[in-house]
Regions:
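Structured interaction patches on ligand/partner-binding surfaces of diverse proteins
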Residues: 548-569
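Catalytic domains of carbohydrate-active enzymes, especially glycoside hydrolases
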Residues: 52-77, 336-338
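Active-site-adjacent "subsite" loops/lids of carbohydrate-active enzymes
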Residues: 31-37, 45-47, 125-207, 211
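Short, acidic Ser/Thr/Gly-rich low-complexity loop/linker segments typical of extracellular
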Residues: 497, 501, 507-535
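Short Pro-Gly-centered beta-turn/loop motif in secreted/extracellular proteins
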Residues: 530-542, 548
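Proline-threonine-serine-rich low-complexity tracts
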Residues: 574-691
């Protein structure tokens, strides 16, 4: 039976000297600021020219908002010009982008001038939503759907490693499934269990962070798709994630029969799918803050149905078992700065109303060392219902914990009509859809724009929910960091990535006592060999890697973790120290006339693993006199380095030294895995010539 990693790789078991955060249930101080954000979805809000951008910013200002989650990637395309992907896919009659216009750059300029943060809102996994044969394919030839979804030349899906799409085993024609299980409803999704799809997504998004002065990167649909079909339960699992490459990786890792599919309720398969999503979140998080330590990584997270009421009931939440998005583990690990569950609940429906409070309670109690905000759904509420939810969002949980704010979905649909609205004033009136200006006025005054109509009981609530502007909350792990992070890639002796290899990141013993944060993290590499550790105590660390079926390998090199920084520490498994062949000429210095003689130290160093890093020299004199230093030679990672070095030695000895004077010439060869081998030769100044 094959030895495998523990099931909960996604959580990354953490061994800590002490944790700086309180437990999930411990009370926290109320935040000093308050996030007031709007989702700006480009499906329903234009960002096509400067006038559109000004309209969005002015709406935010009117509502006293301080952050915008503005959608700039919908389906593998870009609402920004400096991108690794093609331009925005806009289909008539939607408004096209003005020529040469960069929506994201312009929004950053205008919003920052107004004191408003801009978070780039990106759809991560869903990459295409039109029929590939009836309607036109993506316009950009290198669109991931064109290259790794549907092959227009053959009129068929790509196969094997070339196919990045996730897949259900539910037959086509059932539950709106088509295209051999790869189209769920209207959508095609990439599968993060495919290493190339995960790497591509991380590269696209970290490139955005590198090129734009965004305050944050906001991840949407960072999960598997939900499938609407009867009979799905936490026990049954879901038929999704069956990308051929991901399944092959799973079978290899767990010693399953190649070419077979795991059952949808297989516990190992369930955790595997959660791990694939968690791995890409970790990779995006560390890659982004390595570029800009102050950028805030957030996510719009699944909050279907009612919220968990106990720790154990999280496993029955649909985020966990249906779409394999274990976002509770993400906040605990620290790979999201802001968790924003989409708790879109109709306040006017008595059976649904408690769900808002359940998710509010859970969210406030599960921030750990990070922030949480509540995603409020204007798209399912009248203004009156939304105001009630906002007020409850800013109260503490029963355990005394607070959310850091909330975000409204969306700027385009801030409210809906509600028949017999129980919260209208007076109660029971049918309320129509109101304008965004009315919604903003309700937030800031509690009244309509013209002041004639109240949106809540002003006697009970004399102060509106947003009576004045608010600053965004401080994030002390960014403003005053006490912990650092490490990330890298692991390759084996043949240079191949180590897929799902066990990883242990450990602080060296004997170092200064760390602050109250992590000193050891246990986890695994992803399918591309990526690993990472978050919130480590500053100090010196080594990494131990255990590839499947192989002995553990601990790096001879170490890396220093520094508070507030991400250290890049790649690992190539190299179990053999370099070899060195050494000779010297002359080996005897005669006559002993006190003159300096150049001894040629020549040889060759070889390392078939990581290559030669350096060749260094040392002269030892039995008389104990200090000898001149000799500069080392860089190996440049070459597998072989030939060297010839002149070493100046004094041809002299003590007159009564019958054994003569002995110099020992050492050469130390170090490879790029920090393994070293030393060879030495002796040179003698004899008492008598020939002796």
């Amino acid at each position: 039976m094959r030895r495998s990693l523990p099931a909960r790789l996604a959580v990354w078991a953490v061994l800590a000297a002490a944790l700086s955060s309180a437990s999930a249930a411990e009370a926290a101080d109320p935040p000093t600021g308050q996030y007031r954000a709007f989702w700006v979805d480009t499906f329903n809000t234009n960002l096509s020219d400067h006038a559109d951008v000004l309209a969005v910013v002015n709406n935010a200002r009117a509502a006293r908002a301080n952050a915008l989650f503005a959608q700039v990637r919908r389906r593998g395309d870009s609402w920004y010009l400096d991108s690794l992907e093609g331009p925005a896919e806009i289909v008539a009659p939607a408004k096209p982008l003005a020529p040469g216009f960069d929506p994201l750059a312009d929004l950053i300029t205008e919003a920052h001038a107004a004191g408003i943060e801009v978070h780039a809102f990106v759809i991560a996994a869903a990459i295409w939503n039109r029929h590939p044969t009836i309607l036109a394919p993506p316009a950009w030839p290198d669109h991931p759907f064109n290259r790794h979804g549907f092959n227009q030349a053959t009129g068929a899906l790509y196969t094997e490693r070339d196919n990045w799409l996730t897949r259900t085993l539910i037959p086509d024609g059932t539950a709106s499934v088509t295209f051999s299980g790869t189209r769920i409803g209207a959508e095609f999704w990439v599968d993060f269990g495919h290493p190339d799809a995960a790497a591509y997504t991380a590269d696209v998004l970290t490139h955005l962070v590198e090129r734009y002065d965004v305050d944050g990167l906001h991840l949407d649909r960072i999960r598997y798709p939900e499938i609407t079909i009867a009979g799905q339960t936490p026990t049954s699992g879901t038929s999704i994630g069956y990308n051929e490459t991901s399944v092959a990786r799973f079978n290899q890792h767990y010693g399953r029969t190649a070419g077979t599919n795991p059952a949808q309720n297989d516990p190992l398969w369930n955790q595997w799918r959660r791990d694939q999503v968690t791995n890409v979140v970790r990779r995006i998080y560390l890659g982004s803050i390595a570029i800009n330590p102050q950028v805030k990584i957030s996510g719009s997270l699944i909050a279907f149905g009612g919220g968990p009421t106990t720790e154990a009931s999280w496993n029955s939440a649909e985020a966990y078992w249906r779409v394999y998005q274990d976002w509770r583990a993400w906040t605990e690990e620290g790979i999201l700065d802001i968790a924003a569950p989409m708790a879109y609940k109709a306040e006017h429906t008595a059976t649904i109303r408690p769900q808002w409070d359940q998710w509010s309670e859970w969210t406030k109690n599960h921030a750990y060392n990070r922030s949480t905000i509540l995603g409020q759904g204007g798209l399912v509420n009248a203004i009156e219902g939304s105001l009630r939810q906002v007020r409850r969002a800013f109260t503490p949980s029963a355990a005394g914990n607070y959310a850091s704010g909330l975000s409204f979905y969306s700027m385009a649909t801030s409210n809906i009509a509600v028949a017999n609205n129980p919260f209208s004033i007076p109660a029971g009136q049918s309320t129509p859809v109101r304008s965004f200006a009315e919604f903003a006025s309700a937030l800031t005054t509690g009244r309509s724009v013209d002041g004639t109509r109240a949106y809540e009981d002003l006697a009970a609530n004399p102060v509106p929910v947003f009576p004045a502007e608010a600053s965004v909350p401080d994030m002390p792990w960014k403003s005053h960091p006490v912990a650092g992070h490490v990330m890298g890639f692991v390759r084996d002796e043949a240079g191949q990535v180590v897929d799902t290899g066990a990883v242990n990141i450990a602080r060296e013993a004997g170092a200064d006592p760390p602050p109250a944060t992590r000193t050891t993290i246990v986890g695994a590499t992803d399918g591309g060999g990526f690993y990472g550790g978050v919130d480590l105590a500053p100090g010196t660390y080594r990494v131990t890697v255990t590839p499947l079926g192989q002995p553990a390998y601990t790096t001879a090199c170490a890396t220093d973790v520094i508070a507030g920084q991400v250290r890049r520490f790649d690992v190539t498994i190299d179990r053999e120290a370099p070899t060195v062949v050494l000779g010297a000429s002359p080996r005897e210095l005669w006559p002993p006339n006190h003159r300096t003689v150049n001894v040629t130290l020549a040889g060759a160093a070889e390392d078939a693993g990581t290559g030669i890093d350096s060749v260094s020299f040392r002269v030892l004199d039995e008389y104990g006199l200090v000898q001149p230093e000799v500069a080392p030679i860089s190996g440049g990672g070459l597998p072989r380095v030939d060297f010839s070095q002149a070493i100046p030695l004094e041809a002299t000895r003590a007159g009564k030294d019958k054994n003569g004077r002995t110099y020992t010439l050492e050469v130390t060869v170090t490879d790029r895995a920090c393994q070293a081998r030393t060879a030495a030769v002796t040179v003698v100044v004899p008492h008598d010539q020939g002796h």
